Amino acid sequence: FHLDAQGPRLIEVNTNAGGAMLNAILARANQACCESVEWAFQRNVSLARLEDTFLAMFLAEWRSQRGEQPLRSVAIIDDQPGEQYLAPEFELFRQLFERRGLRAIVVDATELIYLDGQLRHADQPIDLVYNRLTDFDLSEPRHEALLHAFTAADVVVTPHPRAHALHADKRNLVTLSDDALLA
């Protein structure tokens, strides 16, 4: 949900782990200090391994498009990322990537440039973009560099516009709730 002048509105069904890292940290804190909420935690979920699960999600997306080519750099992008509600999570993901040996940055999508077949921020090439934009199809002119790099397959974007169109576009909920179409 996003808040605008008309109040909260559904804009997507998440295709990424948005909010998951913050929730994992909160769950670990609750588990460590609060026996009274222990009943709320599934025994088969290892909070200690959740970061590995999150990282595996990004690596699987990378490998699906790049095979065994090594992933070196990740850009976590949004418009004005420091102003976003989940900005602390962006930083947590950046730290996770760096702990695993990847160069990682949190950057405003408008600061990206596409030059000579490579998406870059300043002088640094970007291999994978963790896309937190709500411009799901990258149609806004300010995201032109990312759109061109993505359509040329010069960067891996996750989640990518096609994933949103297939799995997360809220307009699909109409179809999913139409008994006649589902019959």
Where are these regions (language model features)?
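Conserved acidic functional residues
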Residues: 1-2, 12
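Domain-scale recognition of functional cores that engage charged ligands
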Residues: 2-5, 19-24, 28-183
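Short hydrophobic beta-strand that contains or immediately precedes a catalytic carboxylate
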Residues: 10-17
